[in-house]
Amino acid sequence: MQRSLVGSEMCIRDSPVRVELSRKINRKAIDELSSFLEIGKKHFISVKTPLDMSFVFQLQHYLRDKQELFFEKRTPRDTPELSLKESILGQVEKKDVLLSYPFESMKPFIKMLNDAAEDPDVVSIKMTLYRVADKSQIIDALIEAAENGKEVIVLVELRARFDEANNIEMSHRLEDAGCQILYGLGDYKVHSKLCLITKKKGDGFEYITQIGTGNYNEKTSRLYTDLSLITANQEIGADASRVFMALQRGETVSDGDVKHLLVAPKCLQNKIVDMIDEQIANKNAGKPAYIGVKINSLTDKVLIDKLIDASQAGVKVELIVRGICCVKPQVEGATDNITVISVVGRYLEHSRIYRFGVGDDEKIYIASADFMTRNTVRRVEVATPVYDAHAKDKIRHIFDTIMTDDEKGKELCADGEYVDRKINSTPIDSQEQFFEEAYKNADKSADNQ
């Protein structure tokens, strides 16, 4: 897409979905607006709340003397797995690293991009961008890399809802600095969180790959719970390279193109179905079987039906679904073995985790995709396997702790109602526990330095 056409293209794509009114207006005005906006009258909604709530953010300045109204201040901690005094690239070459936001800081990832921008052995940086902060250090690092002669290829998704204007402005900044900009795919939104750094090594090249569940956004990394894997696994890097090559051609990868990554729209849903079938087969053969999934929403009928099949086969299925969930658990003869909980706490639960199996045979993935049809077959999404033993244990701990949350967690019942949970003698707030652990780990790391 030519740069000069980007703004007009966005105007064509944008269309209203509803009209909110702060007070009643006469029917003729509604008729005129309905005709002009080409939107049905049932989508005109009167609300009692102010139409623009942005003023709420300013209230904190007027309520400073009422600290009882505020949460206790929490600051993301430095992970003990990395030293910010050394090259992040060099450290990741030795060992995979899993960052858990907002409990751990995003600083190591930003430093890695800055290191890559200055490293003479780095030849290219490729990224998919969906939402970024207004004053983004990530964008600054990419610009510096391009100005230093690196090949920087960035796919900017212009259809990220509510961020269209910011993404257009950001893409222009990158392009002016010499970055090659890809403006998404016509048929699919690119929602994946993928970054690939390529370095010269001897007579060949080396990949450093980052795959995450959340956006490359410094602000939301302090407000959303997300996971970010940084790995020097060369086969995962080769898969990521094929994903970017396909995107540069305006295409998406197919089953035969990738060996490790699950990539929607063509090879994510079917792979998940296969892994659910494996657990059903294990249960039928008398072997241990387990499925655990943490997502924002569950609406994909193909995956719902397959989870019900697993439950009917006797497989234990644990689902952490923050929002929409179109499966009713604990229905006799259908979902007896499915448990669904939702955690709504101080931070927005946003990470996606897929678990299949038990013990040494367990497969663990982190992903950008929810179990929604829009994610599994209508977007470009990426899920990565986690192979590092420490990272896998960290994900298990996160998942299992959330499953015991009886402070902010609610359990979905067969009648569709969410109820309080009583599991622990002292209620557990999983998010608070993760922050306490992050503080302790950071303190121990500081003591050992």
Put a short name on every predicted segment.
Residues 1, 23, 148-220, 230, ...:
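PLD/PLD-like phosphodiesterase catalytic module centered on the HKD motif
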Residues 8, 113, 137-147, 307:
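Histidine-anchored nucleotide/phosphate-binding helix
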Residues 15-17, 93-100, 121-128, 151-157, ...:
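Glycine- and acidic
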Residues 1-7, 12:
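Single conserved hydrophobic/aromatic residue that forms the stacking wall/gate
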Residues 41-124, 203-275:
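Active-site cores of enzymes that catalyze phosphoryl transfer or operate on phosphate-rich substrates
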Residues 133-140, 302:
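Active-site core of PLP-dependent enzymes with the aminotransferase class I/II
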Residues 31-38:
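Internal gly/pro-rich beta-alpha loop/helix module
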